[in-house]
Amino acid sequence: MSLFEELIEGKKKDKQIVKSFETKETLSDQIFEEQKKGHFVMREDIRKKLLEISDDFVESFGVDFFIHDVVLTGSLANYNWSQYSDVDLHIIIDFEESKYEMELLKEFFDAKKNVWNEKHNIKIKGFDVEVYVQDISEDHISSGVYSILHGKWVIEPKKEEPNIDDRKILEKGEEYGKKIDKLVSIGIKKDTMTHIEGLRKKIKEFRQSGLETGGEYSYENLTFKLLRRNGYIQKLLRLKTALTDKKLSVAQ
């Protein structure tokens, strides 16, 4: 495939991804069943399987923590689910109940999450499972949160018809994509890590500002989702890993 064909194919895929942000008429019938008109509950076989997965993840901690809840959040717990959705499984823990320092706990759980997610390739009805440890006091902006532990909605989603500006999302996504491609093309140099961390911070703050002002359907959050689904976030993280590996290696 030529470079031109790759660019055309990439733009086509991006448009398909942005199209997937549109809301559906119902929640995913692979995960939920309609109990009564407009009210959905999680399928019991799915709920039990997700509890098994969360138990396996919690066992990997090697330390006892009280689990306040296990929840499904993200697009799969909402009307904007699509083929690109993940099963976002959040384990809710109160960090203040621990004797360990907050920053140490965050680093510990992030490390456990990364190792577990990389080690496993679990799918629920074709959707990838991603686990995460969430502090009970953490601000988590989501209009759909389902308690798997208790079998009920913490926040029941409402069907909305958001005004999604496809062009704006695609343009911003392309802008960030070019910046990431430029870093990759430059390769591993002395100041590359500084640029990577700077861009990661910029993207994170860009997304967070959108979540705080416009919620899940803000163009900032949807631009981030585009970058994650088209592989650009992973491309940036792979470059960071390659740089770290080179820094820690000793040449023959």
PLM feature segments, named:
Residues 1-11, 19:
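Proteolytic processing junctions in secreted/extracellular precursors
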Residues 13-85, 93-252:
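Catalytic core of pol beta-like nucleotidyltransferases
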